[in-house]
Amino acid sequence: MAEKTYVMTLAEKKQLEAELEEYKLVRRPEVVERIKIARSYGDLSENSEYEAAKDEQAFIEGQIQILETKIRYAEIVDSDAVANDEVAIGKTVVVQEVGTSDKDTYHIVGAAGADIFSGKISNESPIAQALIGKKVGDKVAIESPAGSYSVEILSVEKTS
């Protein structure tokens, strides 16, 4: 069975690599040291410091595994290969809801880089899927849990 690929920009991959390095070179050694100190307290059956450190170690190892998988199966997209006014991964798009003055700005990224609080939406999200491939001036129907609405694409720029 083929592994899932993780679509992302080169910048997103580099960010994941930096995060992986942080886990391997900083967080993993810190938790190993905390486990060592907690063991020195003696009886492990009622040692909450030891249990907490072991739980954190399991979390860290899980994160390392997830990051390694995303990096290994990364599919890098080049937003420069797409027309300047076309919505794609690695682009920032400004849209205005038709019939209102409401404007929204979205940075379209691969799923691994999504962060809705900073306006970074996954290419797999309904909004991004509706916008990808469209150009400035296009009107696009967006399906959301709250209902359907239309937006006009006002601008598209490469995300820095």
Curated annotation (Swiss-Prot):
One family name in Pfam for this protein: GreA_GreB
UniProt key word Amino-acid biosynthesis: no
Residues forming coiled coils: 1-72
A Gene Ontology biological process term: regulation of DNA-templated transcription elongation
Gene Ontology molecular function terms on file: DNA binding; RNA polymerase binding
Record keywords: Coiled coil, DNA-binding, Transcription, Transcription regulation
InterPro entries noted in UniProt: GreA/GreB_C_sf, TF_GreA/GreB_CS, Tscrpt_elong_fac_GreA, Tscrpt_elong_fac_GreA/B, Tscrpt_elong_fac_GreA/B_C, Tscrpt_elong_fac_GreA/B_fam, Tscrpt_elong_fac_GreA/B_N, Tscrpt_elong_fac_GreA/B_N_sf
PROSITE patterns: GREAB_1 (PS00829), GREAB_2 (PS00830)
NCBIfam families: greA (TIGR01462), PRK00226.1-1 (NF001260), PRK00226.1-4 (NF001263)
Family in the record: Belongs to the GreA/GreB family.
HAMAP family with a match to the protein in the record: GreA_GreB
Purpose: Necessary for efficient RNA polymerase transcription elongation past template-encoded arresting sites. The arresting sites in DNA have the property of trapping a certain fraction of elongating RNA polymerases that pass through, resulting in locked ternary complexes. Cleavage of the nascent transcript by cleavage factors such as GreA or GreB allows the resumption of elongation from the new 3'terminus. GreA releases sequences of 2 to 3 nucleotides.
Annotated protein name in UniProt: Transcription elongation factor GreA
Species classification: Bacteria, Bacillati, Bacillota, Bacilli, Lactobacillales
